[in-house]
């Protein structure tokens, strides 16, 4: 199964994400590199969208933490194969069927530009993707169905419109970006989609001083029970990620709107 037990989360993941140590940010740096590769591959396929990229990152986190691969030591080719395989599985699980040759050709183009001395052919890349796909599916327990946190943000759009003068679409877009960035962390392996959504809104509320947004109102809109301890826990983890980022206010449209 994709989701983790509370015991696994407490014993292995939570300490890594909450303790003040360099390992968290070192690991995050390498995960960002994986994310960048996935973004590039995703941008080159015709059905490119944020949903596919987010699902890909979920699969990567599960595979990464199940197999304990060392992101520092794996080869650039292995990174490409892992990213391509995660994207390939994600396209299928989101009902976007593409040929594996599409992924293979994108990876080959990257190799030609970034690894020109690497001697490898298309058939070998294809075989490696199929092998890695099976390994990733094993780490997922062959369960690829996963609910993403984006839907709940759309659901509360009317709430945004009722309590603030800020364009609801600006809020929606910003929430989507916060959620998308949160996939750099493995929080999606434990916390529910609605809880992640509310946590991201809570971070956004604090960062942009959106005093009109009441988190309790959002909790009441959720069809699932929201555990307040888990909400604070998830919020703290996401906030830690954004506190580390220097470009937290890079969304100038929102920042300008709020300041006015």
Question: Which residue stretches match the model-derived regions?
Answer:
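A eukaryotic "domain-start" boundary segment
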Residues: 1-50, 260
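Structured all-alpha helical bundle cores of eukaryotic regulatory proteins
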Residues: 26-198, 202-232
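Intrinsically disordered, low-complexity regions enriched in small/polar residues
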Residues: 5, 14-15, 61, 144, ...
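Long alpha-helical rod scaffolds of large eukaryotic non-enzymatic complex subunits
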Residues: 218-260
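Short linear sequence elements within intrinsically disordered, low-complexity coil regions
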Residues: 8, 14-18, 175, 240, ...
């Amino acid at each position: 199964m994709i989701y983790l037990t509370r015991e696994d989360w407490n014993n292995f993941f939570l300490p890594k994400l909450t303790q003040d140590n360099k390992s968290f940010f070192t690991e995050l740096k390498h995960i960002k590199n994986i994310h960048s590769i996935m973004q590039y591959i995703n941008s080159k396929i015709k059905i490119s969208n944020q949903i596919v990229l987010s699902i890909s990152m979920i699969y990567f986190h599960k595979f990464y933490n199940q197999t304990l691969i060392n992101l520092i030591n794996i080869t650039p080719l292995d990174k490409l194969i892992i990213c391509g395989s995660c994207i390939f599985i994600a396209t299928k699980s989101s009902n976007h069927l593409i040929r594996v040759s599409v992924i293979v050709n994108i990876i080959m183009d990257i190799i030609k530009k970034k690894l020109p001395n690497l001697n490898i052919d298309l058939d070998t890349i294809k075989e490696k993707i199929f092998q890695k796909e099976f390994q990733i599916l094993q780490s997922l327990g062959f369960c690829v169905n996963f609910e993403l946190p984006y839907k709940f943000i759309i659901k509360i759009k009317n709430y945004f419109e009722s309590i603030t003068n800020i364009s609801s679409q600006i809020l929606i877009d910003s929430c989507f970006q916060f959620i998308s960035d949160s996939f750099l962390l493995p929080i999606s392996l434990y916390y529910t989609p609605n809880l992640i959504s509310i946590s991201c809104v809570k971070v956004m509320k604090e960062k942009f001083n959106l005093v009109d947004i009441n988190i309790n109102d959002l909790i009441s809109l959720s069809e699932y029970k929201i555990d307040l301890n888990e909400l604070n826990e998830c919020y703290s983890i996401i906030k830690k990620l954004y506190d580390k980022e220097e470009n937290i206010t890079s969304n100038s449209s929102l920042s300008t709107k709020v300041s006015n």
